[in-house]
Amino acid sequence: MSAVTPVLDGLAIRLYIQPKASRDQIVGLHGDELKVAITAPPVDGQANAHLIKFLAKQFKVAKGNVTIEKGELGRHKQLRIVNPQQIPDVVAALIE
């Protein structure tokens, strides 16, 4: 499975998260996952909440349309983004 896979209602994305980064950004490929750097620390779910907010803004969807399917407690996550209104260039290049 690649980092970004189109599914029936949107996109399934496999991520590698770098918490406590200097800025929020979609970095690019990290092995077979998409690396995303976020500024929030991995404490009490802050990083997950910040990640959902950041990705919702990048894909122009409501926060409720971004769900963590796997990896709630780790750096390796699988997310689903329902009906993205915009796809960032880094992600668009990875869609198979």
UniProtKB/Swiss-Prot annotation:
Gene3D superfamilies: YggU-like (3.30.1200.10). InterPro entries: DUF167, YggU-like_sf. SUPFAM superfamilies: YggU-like (SSF69786). One of its GO terms (cellular component) is cytoplasm. It comes from the Bacteria. It holds the Pfam family DUF167. HAMAP family: UPF0235. Belongs to the UPF0235 family. This is UPF0235 protein Spro_4033. It comes from Serratia proteamaculans (strain 568).
